[in-house]
Structures are given as C-alpha cells and as structure tokens.
Amino acid sequence: MKTVTRWTIRIVIALIVLTVALGFWAHHFLEQSLAVLDGSTHLSGLSSSVTVERDNLGVPTIRGKSRLDIARALGFIHAQDRFFQMDLTRRRSAGELSELFGKRAVAVDKAARRNEFRVLAKNVLLRASKEERDVVEAYTEGVNAGLASLKSKPFEYSLLRLTPAPWKAEDCVLVAASMLITLQDDQNRYEQSLVTLHDTYGRKSLPFFASLITPDDAALDGSTAPGAPIPGPDVINIRDAKPVALNSLIDDGSLMPGSNSMAISGAHTTTGAAMVANDMHLEISVPGRWYRACFIWDNNRVTGVTLAGTPLIIAGSNGHVAWGFTNSCVDTADMVPIARSEQDNEYHGPGTSGILKMSRHESVILVKGSDPVKMTTDWTIWGPIIGKDSDNRPLALHWTGHMAEAFNFSLLGMEKATTADEAIEVAHQAGIPIQNILIADSAGKIAWTVAGKVPKRVGFDGRLTVPWVYGDRHWDGLLSSKETPVWSPTGVDYLWTANQRILGGEALQLLGDAGYARPARAAQIRDDLKNLVTTKPKGIVPKDLLSVQLDDRALALIKWKELLLNQIAAMDPEKGIDLDQLPEAVKTDDLRADASSTAYRLVREFKLATWNRVFTPIFAPCVEAYPEFQYRHMVSEYTLWTLVQQKPMHLLAANYLSWDDLLHQSVNDILVSLKKVHVSPKEATWGKQNTLASKHPFSALLPSLLTRSLNFPADQMSGGDDMPRIQGQTFGASERFAVSPGHEEEGIFEMPGGQSAHPLSSYYIAGHEAWVKGEPTAFLPGKTEHVLTLTTQ
C-alpha cells in the first residue's frame, strides 16, 4: 500500500513539474512574438529616422520628417501589434478565410468571392493618385518589415501551423472592403424585403409598415410627416390566417452597425473652437476594432483612430479640423431584373444595346486540409446575379461596392484640411463606405455632409426594384461635390447623427433609403444637445458631450412601462400566471439601462415580446416568399405603438381573443424567460442579461481554460438600445471621443480592448476598464514610457 502511495505522489509531482515546465515553455514561446517597444531597428525605405513613442496605454506617437515615413512606420507597428487581425480582415472580403480555417469557412468565402474584391482592389490601385499610391506602398513595405522583425511569427499562426502571407498593397483596399460589407448589405436584402412586402400585400401596405418619414423623426432640417393610417382589411387581413410559430430569437433591429456623432459650434464652447464627439457602434471584437495613433511630421499633428491594414487616420483631429463618422444608410445599391433572351447565357441590355452575353466568372477557393472548391458567378453589365424575383427572373446587384471609382485613399486630405469647407471637399472626394460626417473647425464652424460616393439615379428613386431594360432608368455616374447635400446653416448651434434620416425633400431624393435607424436615439441626442447649449451657453467642454454619449435613459420605453403596469393590473392571477414581484420590479427605478436596473430589462422584454407576437404573423407570408425578409429595418416605433393603441382586429392573429389577450401573453413571456434562467423579477437586473461576451477568434478552437485570458472580461454592462449609450453583449461603442481642434489636450477618448492583439502584452486590454465604466482617458497620448527608433541603416 505504501508503495502505491509513493508512486502516486511521484506521479502527481511529475505532472505538476511537467505542467509548470510546459507553462514556462508556452510563456517563453509566446513572448517571442511580442512587439518591439524599445531600442532601435533598421527600417528600409525611410528618408530619415522615425521615433515611435508609446504611453502607458501603448498609444504610439510617430514622429518623422515626411508623411511617407509616417506611413512606413505605422505599417511596421500595425504588423507587430495586429497582423493576424489584419490578415483576417483582408481575407474576409477576399473570400480566403478557408485557407486558415478549412471547411468551416467555405460558405463565408463563397459569399465574399462573388464580389471579386481582390480584382477590384487591384483596379483601385491602378486608378489611385501618385500620392495615395506612394503612401499605400510605403505602408505595405512597413507592414512586411514589421512582420519580419518579430522574433517569431504571430502566435496565432503557430497554433494554426501556418506561415503568414506577406502583405500586398491591394490588401489595404480589401480591408476597406471588409468594412464596407460590415456597414452595407452585399445582398441588398432591405430592397428585396420592401419588394416582397409590396408583392405580398400591395403598394398600400408600404406607407404604414415601411414609412420613410414618420411623425417622430429627428432629421436635421426638422422634416416629419403625419403617421400613415393602418391599412384596412381590404389590404391585409390575418384574422383568418393559419397561426404561425413565434421566433425564438427576437431581432427588432435595435443593435445594428451604426453610430452616434454630435457637434457643437464654437459659440457655445469654452475655447471658441467647435467640438465634435463620435462613437461608432460595431461588433465589439477581440482585439478591438481600432488602433489609436498620433502622427507628427513637418509641423503637422494628427491624432485619432486608425484601422489596422490601412495607412489613414479614420476619425480624429488635426489641430484645425476634427471629424467623426456614422453609418449613413444612404442607398448605394439597386436590384436589376434581368430579361433573358432565348439563349440561357444571353440577356437584353438597356435601351437599344441589344442582346448581351453573361460573363461567367470562375473562382477557386483554397481550403486548408481539404480539396479546393470551385465556384461560378454570372455577371451582367450591372453586376453579379445574386438571386431571383417573384417572377423567377434573375436579379443582378448594381452596387457602388463593385465600382473601382467608389474606392480611394483621398481621406488622406483630411489630415491637412484647415477649415470645415476644405474638409467637406475632402469628404466628397473620399472613396469610403458612404458615411455621415460631422466636421468641427477651430474657427467655430460645424457642418454635416456625406463622405463617399453616391449613385446618381435617373428615372426612379431606388426604393423598389424596377426594370432597367428600357433604358429610361439607370445610374448617371456618381453625384458630384456640388450635387452632394451639405447642412451647415448660418448660426447653427449643434448637429447630430444617429443613423437616422438626415434630411427630407430633394436631398432625400438624392440620397435614397437603405433602411434608416429608428429616430428615438437621434431625438434623445438632439434634445440633450439643446439642453446643453441652453444651460451652458458658452461653457461646453468635452466631458459634456461624453455625458450625452453615456445617456442611458430609456425614454422610448416610458410609455411601454405604463402599458406593462396597466396590463399587469388587469390580469387575473387565478389563471395560473404568477405575477408576484413583477409590478414591484418594474417600478424600482426611473427606467435607465443601468446594469443594476430590473425595470429596464423587464419593460424591454415586454416590448420585444409584443413586437414578436404582433409582427411575426403579419409578415409570415413575406418570410415564406423571401426567407431573408427583414422587417426589422422597416417598422418604426410609430407602427407598433399605433397597432397596440388602435387594436385593429384584422391585424390580430387568430390565436388571440383580443389585443389585450396578446399583451397579457407578452407579460407571460417575461415570466417564462425569467424561469428559463432561474431568476425572479426582483433579481432580474439588466446587467445579468447584458453581460459582455466578446470572444477572441480562437475561443472556439482552444480549451476554455486557455481562452479565459484571450476574451474580454464578462462585465455587466450599462446601456441598451434606442438611446445614446448603445450596448449589447457583443455590440456597442467601438470607441468614444470628444475633441475641439486646436485644443486636443482637453479632449477625451475611450475604447474597448487595447492596442495590442497579443495576450501577454501589457497593452492587450489597457484602457478597456475605462470604456466599461464610461471613464474618460486623454485624447492625446500620455507620458512616454517606451521609445523605439526606426533607422535608415
């Protein structure tokens, strides 16, 4: 027995020693791929030495003699800190993820390959100006030098047992294309959904269920419209329709890629310079989406966020002008029905162009550990065939995303713009995914316009699919700078964007509709800004705009809270529904999306349950006709609230006795959902549901013990939807900043995650906690802690 015990002890000790040894080996192995922070290293191609100074958060200040040297150095540090992320981003749009992850990525690659972004990227570079091309080439050479300077390849490639492919200049365009397909739908499902609604219930259904202008809109020009009446039973009547199953996962469209931006004129700031604040709402990825940087060269200083894989400051300030973006929801795509000829590979061209032949584009997807996958896409003069309409006609996608002239690196010009007017001109030349841009200059002026390329439609508004074969409906190129709407009225005090419809009238006709966000968030920002300029007419500072960004009051739910309490009071407990604690939990606070709030969670669930029970049966025929039907983009708060208030029986599913019956079932849905997670109403805080769940791409590939240090902490988050502080489990503000140009030292910034993508780096999540808590850090880099000198020899 003693012998067995001794051997057991020896085995345990050996296992402990082996585990410790493996841990030390793994740590040492991972350390080899950490970025170089101090000392000096040669970087070929520099005209003179460049210094990279990092502060306590790892934010670099890059000092050089020329913009080309800055680009080369930026490429170097991007590669050292973020190369694997850059690689995933270029491969996402190129359709090359299967080379890393095997069969599991083939479906994603097929969808991307149809766009042929790598071919387009090469054409974009051929069209680029010499200045832009030189910057991209310098950046690319810097990336490859930075990758080569690591002692070991980035750790992700060691785990995948692969060698990283060198960076190419065209990959910078592919990174932009990946952002494009994040912000825009390369299947144009919004237009196809509108057409499906039209085909299912007729044109009379559109004003109510897909209204372009509503009474609650928060446009910059104040444009609104009376609410459309509910369609009568002659248009739509579901009372006798067969009951349908409810969706298990409710997506009401409240957490979609978007953003907030706001600007205050210099008349209301302490400095006299205008001020801009920006928080771009995206998936909270690991590592974070952005890479902070400050560039200093030849009397220029530009500070802001870069996108690893590109050489640009995307949003920030240059001392004269500050700018920020939000997704514009401008219509940049149209579906074109294809009229086939007698030959299967031929179709009728527009007007008098006659019979044209389809172009058959073949592609091969390389798959790690498996055979290559071949795919074929038919292209027309308008774009690729991506589906069929209700008459079984092929549909081609005509999209600015397939046009080389819609991509460029002209945003570089923002770095040297000195006035809002100059910045507007740069925005109109920029080839980026079409965005709202708010601009603030040091003289106090603020302005809104769109940055990027907008199609110039002739003969139609682009909302519904129309035939192009007659030649009277087409695109006449892209809008010129003179044709592109600008909003900067004399004496304007503040501006705001939150993915809402920005303008009405002729401007709306030019920009079109790709699914604007519900207006509640924009209206709340507008009203917050109005309150600021009223209470602090000449005293607004950056922290004031941060307070707007962090506004988590659920104003859009106030009426729903009252409705919920009324329904609870009217329900009969004897019917087996346990209402104990529910009223008290709903009344606990003033309805903020605070992590500790029970009221916000419960009222929100009530509204979502009602959304589900009302709209699922109404749109069931649309989903049957078009499985990817997206009513989340269409129906407004006005639509749902009007139905709940007016209670039309012809729009009530047959499995409900009355609208009150439906609302009572929605109340019961709350209780059912709480029972599933074993939480009582008084314990059902919002934070328990809204817990950050952002995971590293390798989380699904490694044991959970190893991935804990890779993923972001599972913090209970404040913030929700339909309010300025947008926050979900994996979605929210990808950064927040507020700054006045010329006064950057007073600016503030916060961002999820850190600068480095390496889990052993002290900068892996540096600054993350400040973002979670809404605590500002400085906009400019702080005191230097590390200095790396990049030398010419």
Walk through the language-model features, giving the residues of each.
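N-terminal Sec-pathway targeting helices
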Residues: 1-18
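Substrate-recognition/specificity elements adjacent to catalytic centers across diverse enzyme folds
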Residues: 10, 23-280, 286, 299, ...
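Structured, non-membrane catalytic/scaffold regions adjacent to prosthetic-group chemistry
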Residues: 48, 126-156, 267, 272, ...
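Proteins synthesized as precursors that undergo proteolytic processing into mature forms
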Residues: 115-119, 140-141, 401-404, 408-435, ...
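Glycine- and hydrophobic-rich flexible loops that cap the catalytic core of alpha/beta enzyme folds
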Residues: 256, 297-312, 316-321, 325-469
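Hydrophobic alpha-helical segments
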Residues: 430-532, 607-611
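Terminal end segments
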Residues: 511-575, 663-793
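Charged, long alpha-helical assembly modules
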Residues: 604-687
